[in-house]
C-alpha cells in the first residue's frame, strides 16, 4: 500500500512544517518582543509649557551622554520675553547674562531601573537651580519635569510635549 505510506509521509511533513513554523514564530516574537516593549527615553525635542501661564515657553533638546540626560534650550518663544534672544539676567556665575538659547538647563538625570534619578534643572526666568525628577507619560509623548528644593513635595511640575 504505497498510497497510504505516501499519505502518512505527507501528513508527517505537513505537521512538521506547521511545528517548524510555530517554532519560528515563537523565536521571532521572543527576539523582537523586548524591542517592542522598550519604553521611550527622554531623549528628543520637547516643547516646554509654563506651569504658571500654561503657554508654550520654548524648545529643549534632551540628549543622552554617557548615561546622563542633558537638556539644552534650542528656542524661546514665550511672551514675557519679547526679545527673541533673551539673556539669563538672574543667573549667577558663568551663566550670568548669557543667552538662554544654547544654555544647558537639565543635567545629572540618569536612568535607574524603570525610573530616572534626581538631577538638576535651571529655571532661566528666575536664575535658580533646582533638584528635578522626570517621568515619561502618555507612552513617551509627554515628559513630566518636577523641580523642587529639598523634597519633591516642595516643588512644581511642568509637562513637556515631545516634538520629535
Provide a role label for each language-model segment.
Residues 3-25:
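Bacterial N-terminal signal peptides that target proteins for export
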Residues 32-34:
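N-terminal signal peptide c-region/cleavage motif recognized by signal peptidases
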Residues 36-45:
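N-terminal helix-cap/turn-to-beta initiation motif at the start of protein domains
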Residues 45, 68, 140-142:
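Structural motif
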Residues 48-132:
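Central antiparallel beta-sheet cores of small beta-barrel/beta-sandwich binding domains
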Residues 91-97, 144-151:
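Short aromatic-glycine motifs in intrinsically disordered, low-complexity regions
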Residues 140-142, 148-164:
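Edge beta-strand at a domain terminus
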